[in-house]
Amino acid sequence: MKTTFLDFEQPIAELEAKIEELRFVQDDSAVDISEEISRLAGKSQQLTKDIYANLTPWQVAQIARHPQRPYTLDYVREIFTDFHELHGDRTFADDLSIIGGLARFNGQSCMVIGHQKGRDTKERAMRNFGMPKPEGYRKAKRLMELADKFGLPIFTFVDTPGAFPGIDAEERGQSEAIGHNLYVMAGLRVPLIATIIGEGGSGGALAIAVGDVVQMLQFATYAVISPEGCASILWKTAEKAPEAAEALGLTAHRLKALGLIDKIVSEPLGGAHRDYKGMAALLKRSLAESLRQFQGMSVKELQARRYERLLAYGKFKETGAQD
């Protein structure tokens, strides 16, 4: 699959194009230019390191939305075995923007739930661009309750611009569905490990992300609104999205500093879309470490830990009035 380069990656794209051109020439020539190819490859790698070491929040948001970034089903294929997808909310319909089912993680039975976008126009429409309707969240709730009943740990993967804002979704109780999920997750008797793998868009993301461990991939984002939406409200123009991204503090490192997430999972050089298997291996290791800390923990201890965790959000300290 040919790599799609973002605007700020154009210097890398030009180098990679030159390397491909030289490889093509080498195949049709008796002249050995392997040293030049190696030199340019090293230069490209160093340039990628330099660019990715100084990303702005807006550039991180672009990476989180990269069309070639791994989605939930990509991680399911690489990390889990014996995945059996379960469908429908048993109330209205089967929302394909959320997928879920039974699987095995390192041989242990578990439940996997996640947002799913699409690769081409047809699949994106089928998946509603990763924006769930109420039936999607109710499907997720049904699967969480099923996992709770059988004592299965839950892994969720978050990647959505947000909950679908259409009239039909509102008519069927979008906010109620999200709120009910938050209630259910808070009381689960099994561990829930949530991973933000791409976009973490507002309540649409939170609806499957009230976890005992919340982790983010290095170039994922998590915020109450998209940069464009924030800019449109504050500055009346989406062109201010870069400034909005800065103000939102949507990057993994910023959220970790604020105590809103627990872990950051490093990505391969150039982002997760450059190396699916490498990214999956890093994520699998992190998931195993997260799950291990709940071994031997009683339900009472697990729920008490989660309760304390939830109450810790938004704490503030009072200071004496200044003269």
UniProtKB/Swiss-Prot annotation:
It is an enzyme of class 2 (transferase). One of its GO terms (molecular function) is carboxyl- or carbamoyltransferase activity. One of its GO terms (biological process) is malonyl-CoA biosynthetic process. It catalyses: N(6)-carboxybiotinyl-L-lysyl-[protein] + acetyl-CoA = N(6)-biotinyl-L-lysyl-[protein] + malonyl-CoA. Its EC number is 2.1.3.15. Pathway: Lipid metabolism; malonyl-CoA biosynthesis; malonyl-CoA from acetyl-CoA: step 1/1. The keyword Cytoplasm applies. It is found in: Cytoplasm. It comes from the Bacteria. Residues 39-293 form the CoA carboxyltransferase C-terminal domain. Gene3D superfamilies: 2-enoyl-CoA Hydratase, Chain A, domain 1 (3.90.226.10). GO terms for cellular component: acetyl-CoA carboxylase complex. Keywords: ATP-binding, Cytoplasm, Fatty acid biosynthesis, Fatty acid metabolism, Lipid biosynthesis, Lipid metabolism, Nucleotide-binding, Transferase. Component of the acetyl coenzyme A carboxylase (ACC) complex. First, biotin carboxylase catalyzes the carboxylation of biotin on its carrier protein (BCCP) and then the CO(2) group is transferred by the carboxyltransferase to acetyl-CoA to form malonyl-CoA. NCBIfam families: accA, AccA_sub, PRK05724.1. Belongs to the AccA family. Acetyl-CoA carboxylase is a heterohexamer composed of biotin carboxyl carrier protein (AccB), biotin carboxylase (AccC) and two subunits each of ACCase subunit alpha (AccA) and ACCase subunit beta (AccD). This is Acetyl-coenzyme A carboxylase carboxyl transferase subunit alpha.
